[in-house]
Amino acid sequence: MNADTILPPCRAIFLDRDGVINRPLIRSGKPYPPSNLGEFEILPGVPEACEVLKGFGFYLVVATNQPDVGRGTLARSAVETIHGWLLQQLPIDRVMTCYHGGATYGDPCDCRKPQPGMLFQAAELLKINLAESFMIGDRWRDVDCGFNAGCKTIFIDWGYEEKLKRDPNFRAHDLLGAAQLIEQLEQRNDART
């Protein structure tokens, strides 16, 4: 391959972290992120799901809001420690993290989900075709972020009290179920070509 060769855009699975990859901490019916590695527990089926998705040639990109850092209640180093460990455990290609506290806390940005900034940044870095990619998440912010970036969306429904603002393209019980759904879609696409 020479320098003039243009590679086709790649596809990605954008994964929310808490509630998709790891078990969130639930307080008053709402999910919260773990604050240290000792609280971080990878959910059952996640390693297998990642292998299935990688087998179809998708990049795996974690896109996570960690606003407690911007709000001063969690050290950035704690989040980075968790992400370093996560990259050793799973075939994740990149972790995109928004550390901003959010507009309510005087820390607005374009990367905090539901804004699509993290997905746009990853798409530029990795040459990702967003229209051929998926955003998988367990909260309304994830679904809206996926739509805002032009991705297909899969909602993992854990029965939180928080309601969705938009209907996702698909629903699954967990990441392995989402991977199996994508596998079925891939097989249908292969049958058409």
Predicted regions and their residues:
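Conserved protein kinase catalytic core
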Residues: N22-P24, G29, R71, D144, ...
